[in-house]
Amino acid sequence: SAAAVKAGRVQPVLLKVYSDDDFLYPGQESGFVQHSLHEVIAEIKKLPGLHLAGLTHFPCLLWDEAAGKVLPTPNLHTLVQARDQLAKSGIAIEQLNVPSATSCTSLPLLAEYGATHAEPGHALTGTIPANQQGDQPERIAMLWLSEISHHFRGDSYCYGGGYYRRGHAQHALVFTPENQKITETNLKT
């Protein structure tokens, strides 16, 4: 707040909300509990240089293997309830930021819930769980280049970021200096 005022700016902020029954990934637990929303907003209003632009939560959609499609999570319902709660109090927000599993096929679902913003994430590379068969509009376009760090009990391990565990990758192409050809292998997750 003080930095925004010093810079002569009003900084738009998103408020992350959650409810006790929501699904949170380990290490990503954060936000303000929905039932304290009005108290939190009252405190934000006391801070000059800040403007509550919207609400967010994560993950709002997830691939459901049994249903064979992306479905809303309880988090999305919490987010929509928080938006409605604010609207009933006369507080309009400009953004409903609804990240996770965004793709061409999930955009209509996001629109049904009034989402204004989403994140493309793995849809940009076509590596979303919904695209395991390559039948979605997004094209698989990702090369993950790494090196083997060590071998242990018949398995090879590698370093490097970018591997998406929930992406259900099953195969890899391996090129070794000793073997000047590409070898297909199975992945363990």
Residue spans of the language-model regions?
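Catalytic beta/alpha-barrel core
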Residues: S1
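Short beta-strand segments
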Residues: L14-Y18, Y159
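A conserved acidic, glycine/proline-rich C-terminal tail/linker
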Residues: E184-T189
